[in-house]
UniProtKB/Swiss-Prot annotation:
Lineage: Bacteria, Bacillati, Bacillota, Bacilli, Lactobacillales
One term under GO cellular component: ribosome
GO molecular function: structural constituent of ribosome
Any Gene Ontology biological process: translation
Keywords: Ribonucleoprotein, Ribosomal protein
Ribonucleoprotein recorded as keyword: yes
Matches recorded under HAMAP family: Ribosomal_bL28
Family statement: Belongs to the bacterial ribosomal protein bL28 family.
Organism: Lactobacillus gasseri (strain ATCC 33323 / DSM 20243 / BCRC 14619 / CIP 102991 / JCM 1131 / KCTC 3163 / NCIMB 11718 / NCTC 13722 / AM63)
The protein, known as: Large ribosomal subunit protein bL28
Transmembrane segments: none
PANTHER family assigned to the protein according to its UniProt record, in alphabetical order: 50S RIBOSOMAL PROTEIN L28, LARGE RIBOSOMAL SUBUNIT PROTEIN BL28A
InterPro entries: Bacterial_rp_bL28 (IPR050096), Ribosomal_bL28 (IPR026569), Ribosomal_bL28/bL31-like_sf (IPR034704), Ribosomal_bL28_bact-type (IPR001383), Ribosomal_bL28_sf (IPR037147)
Gene from which this protein is expressed: rpmB
Length: 61
């Protein structure tokens, strides 16, 4: 399972509830992109969430 190395976001699990309150397991996946960034001064291809890219928390290499 992929995980954002900047914010730590990953797939989370829970229940989908119907009007009659029946429950079915489901998952919410973050929008992860594989990008090249500088890690310790060297370019590396890692998983980063679109939220981290848009907010400017990471710079592309």
């Amino acid at each position: 399972m992929a995980k954002d190395i900047i914010t730590g976001r990953k797939t989370v699990f829970g229940n989908k509830r119907s009007k009659a309150l029946n429950s079915v397991r489901r998952s919410w996946k973050p929008n992860l992109q594989k990008v090249r960034i500088l890690v310790d001064g060297k370019p590396k291809r890692v998983w980063v969430s679109a939220r981290a890219l848009k907010s400017g928390k990471v710079k592309r290499a």
